[in-house]
Amino acid sequence: MPVPTGARPSTRTRVWILVLALLLLGGGATAYTLRAASGRDAATGAADPGFTLDAGAGALYVRDTASGRVARVNPSASGGRVVGGPSCDRFHAAGGTALCLQRRPGVPARSYALVLDRSLREVRRIGLPGIPSRARVSASGNMLSWTMFATGDSYARSSFSTRTSILDLRTGYLVKNMEQIPLTLGGRRHHAPDVNYWGVSFAADDNRFYATVSTAGRTHLVEGDMRSWSARALRENVECPSLSPDGTRIAFKKRVSDGPREPWRLYVYELGTGREHAVAERRGIDDQALWTDRETLAYGYGGEVWSVPADGTGAPRRLAGGASSPAVPHPG
């Protein structure tokens, strides 16, 4: 007999409908969860499996501009680039440790310092104020430092503020802002509200370090001591110091012009003699140079990574196009 119009399904039918609905909803939820997790992984920009810091002596790592991820390049081979590292705005690595500074979009935008192991897996994450500017890891991989712009985005502007931090991985102790370090300037203790530090470079003992301090409109090279937590100014007109592997020389940015167009040149300062010389790179360099070995510097310019002999001879050589933040985790 035909079922009358408007008749309700049987109890068994209703049970099967409910089971089917739950299965469909469960499958959809599972798919949504998987897609969301995949989206989070893509957003964090984790390293691909097998992409590590163990590529051998002299291997060059950079931030690939097109992808925003860390890449390994072979300057001697045309097109020799492997992109597989995390997404970073600034990157540095040494001694089996990497430091990745990230700027995440949002309202408000957020910045992070990611501490990575030799497999480029995240081991610590620190929220940061401002815009990533400089990143450095000591040769041992134990000491890390980063600088953030709190306001402004260029040293060429008349006013800016920085926040420079130091992290000791051996103890986990974090100096959130080194502006409170006791500073000796001109033989006297210096106190001023306009003190800003940036561009830390560590010595081999993981205690001594060099950095730039700005105060009263002038920049100074300072030598710092972690154990005594003190710093003293050595000389003026030094920015973004980078200590050589043998600890005898410092590559730095020297201001050679007050104009906004290419105000800096790359110089090398001998700590023992106090002598300095310009390198063969004559363009204006706004970067913290990297010693790839005892005699060579690498740096970013014009969206590319270049190198030049540190002794003032030779000529600049392009290492990688569409790249920045050079790092050599295992110098040759």
Q: Where do the model's predicted regions map?
A:
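Beta-strand C-termini and the immediately following turn/loop, strongest in propeller blades
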Residues: 60-66, 97-107, 146-153, 198-216, ...
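Short loop/turn segments that connect beta-strands within beta-propeller blades
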Residues: 74-78, 117-121, 169-171, 224-229, ...
